[in-house]
Regions:
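Core catalytic lobe of class I
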Residues: 1-224
Length: 224
């Protein structure tokens, strides 16, 4: 945080909370890269329905379109910020030895529209007034994403482009070397802004090595 040469007072945190976060940053770094993921085990440790408590954080192995799952995760709290990376419905297959696929990434147009409506509807029910949302999506289904977001009550403000250091292999005439991300907020409310005036709609973030991870379209930690 200190190295960013920003006015930390703009973050909006109390002095005590800010001091705690800075102390954590000053602690010794971990032994692994931030994007490193352990090799998958044949018998998974976590199964559907598991809720992990990680300090102040809660991580649920569940379904964002299932209302009961979402309500269990938030435990009665309302959400200030949502970052979502739903299936893009592009039937992507990884180009590693395992030829990894993404579950739910091949639906009919009708199925996908219903899926998006259910997901963004769940997000809206738990969002605070004015809550912000970043929604990763695919260019071919951009209109459907925006329609579902607006139908759920979100207002799309702009589109951010994440520029990758490598492109995704495929048979298209042009290889995708970027990913679009909608920035939106709950409509009818002013969205709180904690950044400065120099933020750009073009993000340059290094793409993790595909052969190290289980999700072929994995997002780097810095995006989160």
């Amino acid at each position: 945080m200190r190295d960013a040469d920003n006015d930390l007072g703009l973050i909006g945190l109390e002095d005590e909370e800010l001091a705690r976060l800075l102390a954590q940053q000053d602690a010794a770094e971990g032994l692994t890269d931030g994007d490193a993921v352990p090799k998958l085990q044949e018998t998974p440790i976590s199964v559907l329905g598991d809720l992990w408590l990680l300090g102040e954080h809660r991580l649920l192995c569940g379904d964002a379109t299932v209302r009961a799952d979402v309500e269990r995760l938030i435990a009665g709290e309302a959400i200030d910020l949502i970052l979502t990376d739903l299936p893009h419905n592009v039937d992507y297959e990884g180009y590693t030895e395992d030829r990894l696929k993404i579950r739910g990434d091949r639906m009919t147009a009708e199925q996908f529209q219903q899926f998006l409506r259910e997901a963004f509807g769940s997000y809206r029910r738990i969002a605070k007034p004015g809550a912000s949302m970043y929604a990763c999506h695919s260019s071919p289904w951009q209109r459907q994403f925006q329609d579902a977001m607006e139908s759920a009550g979100f207002e799309v403000r702009c589109q951010i482009i994440r520029a990758k250091n490598t492109f995704a292999w495929g048979f298209g005439r042009y290889k995708f070397r970027h990913e679009p991300i909608f920035y939106a907020h709950v409509g009818g409310q002013k969205d709180p802004w904690y950044g400065d005036k120099s933020q750009s709609t073009l993000w340059h973030e290094k793409k993790p090595a595909a052969n190290r991870i289980a999700d072929p379209l994995f997002q780097p930690v810095l995006i989160h």
